[in-house]
Amino acid sequence: TGQTLVKSGFAPIIGTRCLGLDGWFSTNILGNRDGLVLDEPANFHTKEVSKLSTLESILVPEDQPDLYTDYYHKVRINYYPPRNDNKEGWDNIDIFGWMGYPMQIKINFLCRDSILAAPLCLDLVLLSDLAARAGRFGIQRFLSFFLKSPMHDYTENEIPVNHLFQQYAILKNAIREMGGYEADQEID
């Protein structure tokens, strides 16, 4: 609903425009129970690993080594009780363009955690029910659009799809197929 959403939506823009990445610094200020739990280093580490992996799967160094091999990526979450359920996310993105010209992108995302999460939970319940009625069982990759960590079969070394627009195409295709129609979105 916040930091990962911004990364999964904005990193494809950087990659599509072939902009280089020098660094991405993200921090969240949370005052709810989520912030309190993540204030513990052991709990934060799990979240940090999932947030860091989002960029690596979208801005793939092997595909464009001159643009994405050596960038600095830092993630922080800060508990601040007066914030309550209001979430504030800051992202500073240092990019470079043609001829190595440095530029910056700043994002200040102010939102309410529960208000962002509640409709996603409802959609997950409804779409899970639809999948069960359609006879779909096991990993439901099309639900990744709603999740921080995309659904994938890690036992088969399947690569998760973190790219928000690809996740959306997968979701639309699955809904069309469950409705008896052919998929109409290509995933590239």
PLM regions: where:
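Glutamate identity and glutamate-enriched acidic tracts
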Residues: E40, E48, E56, E62, ...
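Conserved anion/nucleotide-ligand pocket segment
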Residues: G2-D70, K74
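C-terminal active-site/capping subdomain that shapes the small-molecule cofactor and substrate pocket
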Residues: F96-D188
